[in-house]
Amino acid sequence: MSDLSHYRNIGIFAHVDAGKTTTTERILKLTGKIHKTGEVHDGESTTDFMEQEAERGITIQSAATTCFWKDHRMNIIDTPGHVDFTVEVYRSLKVLDGGIGVFCGSGGVEPQSETNWRYANESGVARCIFVNKLDRMGADFYRVVGQVKKVLAANPLVMTLPIGIEDEFKGVVNLLDMKAYIWDDTGLPENYEVVDIPEDMVEKANEYREQLIETAVEQDDDLMMAYMDGEEPSLEDIKRCIRKGTRDLAFFPTYCGSAFKNKGIQLVLDAVIDFLPSPTEVDPQPLTDEETGEPTGEVATVSTDEPFRALAFKIMDDRFGALTFIRIYSGVLNKGDTILNSATGKTERIGRMVEMHADERTELTSAQAGDILAVVGMKNVQTGHTLCDPKNACTLEPMIFPEPVISIAVKPKDKGANEKMSIAIGKLVAEDPSFQVETDEDSGETILKGMGELHLDIKVDILKRTYGVELEVGQPQVAYRETITLPVEDSYTHKKQSGGSGQFGKIDYRIKPGETNSGFKFTSTVVGGNVPKEFFPAIEKGFAGMMEVGPLAGYPVLDVEVELYDGGFHAVDSSAIAFEIAAKGAFRQSMPKAGPQILEPVMKVDVFSPEDNVGDVIGDLNRRRGMIKDQEAGATGVRIKADVPLSEMFGYIGHLRTITSGRGQFSMEFSHYSACPQNVADKVIEEAKARKAAK
């Protein structure tokens, strides 16, 4: 068995275009995994192996790659930076122990960086920071460090300083050994020399080294006291303190360089080994109750002596077949073992196991706690399922994914391709939990739901290229919701008599608005036996089932509380089905009286605008019913944060490029549901009626 202290499971994440795929490429070249480095702008990079990724120059799926550095095994996940694929980042963070946050030296802390950083904080993932692209025009390492402090409220621990900047960038000062690392112009990462620090940088290097040591020794009281008494700590003591502070998220070791020019990557790799945690040094995964989802108090201890426990964190269908990516938390998995899927209750025999290198693979006969690998040909497994030893059934903490906010209706251009389309869409749904499909019961249309326009564009593209299914795509539809604003006290009786035994159920109830995000809540305060307890579940089921279709436009209903306080029953004619029908009738009767209201999804929008165009951009956001939350001037322009209804954001990127002469950028993610203005609600209701009439 491998020594777990020599394992590092890390993710590389950042804003789109910050250079994380290029950084991964350089790491793979340095660790001997690839011989010729692919360039993203040539569509050749190793981890961007889907056609859509190679074409668009953005990473969509998190490719898992295993490589080695200084006798340590690194499992690297290269995550997407585009906001529509945030679910991939979240999914990856769930199975990682550490990460490298890549920031652009000129762009700084960009919108998606914030989202990824927030997710990483929530997941408790220790990170190093790599400020990339210091060879770029407008690059400023110190400005980016300041942004990390201000925008992310994080504590960057500067470990290297740039020597030169933009075209003059040639190397870094390593503050640990107080030496300069200078690369030549051949572009080869191994062609560098270690020399004395340039004279004009000695003072700054001493200043930053002092800050580094002062911050590090705060992790050890004895060392801090000795340092305050004038005793310089040893290099090993400094590293030990940095390691502890990094693992505790007290600070983030921060490096600089240029991945494209092959400068500075070695020191980042050393930091992964020296400062990021091994699988045994992170909090073990909690086990949860299968029924309630609540923690049981037990954990999956990272050890090869424990029973086998693993999490399926990604499903992929590629040219080799169906792949299930798993992270093993405890125990050992051998080829031929039988394992239990605790979510389905079914067992499966492990056929082939492979170690992935982007889309190439190495066959394995066994794997152990700490490993990230892919199993070939598993059936009935979905993202978030727990795989375990059949004799020691358990459930790991599940993954929770955001609900889609946008949908499109699709149908195959070839009328005979319906079955082919259904199979292909089924595979995509298994791969991506934030992508959903449903069939419109009235029209029979297939509805695809996703996290944004680009998300759905790419799915349609994959269906065409990978599965040969060309689709006719309808206009994007917003996922509106409905709710109520007034309390109602009411009564409903369901009575049916048509020979033989009849049906009878009477309910007296109160309906009122619930708390935001509370969903549907049912309570009973019936005193005595007017409604026997055995009928309560049927009444709850009747009300809950009606929450799927609201009274105004047929959208799902949010945040409603129902209290059953009295009723009546018949000894012969009352039954569960009679009370369920009564609850459905009660819902239809009372909802129009309860002040029903249309809710619309509001997006958190982050726009970058050149200074010259800020007024136009803000004016445009206001016209889109946007609420400006914040503005921040940077070196290259202004960032504007706003809440804007999703319905106003379709096609926004084209409009933004027009008013900023192609220089504007934006990202958005779902924020909350909010009541529509009456004129918008009226339009939504009219459109819903028109769709219904057309079916």
Swiss-Prot record:
Q: Which BP terms from GO are recorded?
A: ribosome disassembly
Entry-linked NCBIfam families: EF-G (TIGR00484), PRK12740.1-5 (NF009381), small_GTP (TIGR00231)
- Segments carrying the region annotation (Disordered) are 279-299
User: What is this protein's name?
Assistant: Elongation factor G
Q: What does this protein do?
A: Catalyzes the GTP-dependent ribosomal translocation step during translation elongation. During this step, the ribosome changes from the pre-translocational (PRE) to the post-translocational (POST) state as the newly formed A-site-bound peptidyl-tRNA and P-site-bound deacylated tRNA move to the P and E sites, respectively. Catalyzes the coordinated movement of the two tRNA molecules, the mRNA and conformational changes in the ribosome.
Return the similarity comment: Belongs to the TRAFAC class translation factor GTPase superfamily. Classic translation factor GTPase family. EF-G/EF-2 subfamily.
Tell me, in one coarse class, where this protein mainly resides.
cytoplasm
tr-type G domain: from which residue to which, for each copy?
5-280
**Localization annotation:** Cytoplasm
At the top level of its lineage, which domain of life is listed?
A: Bacteria
Q: Which SMART domains match?
A: EFG_C, EFG_IV
Q: Which GO terms describe its molecular function?
A: GTP binding; GTPase activity; guanosine tetraphosphate binding; translation elongation factor activity
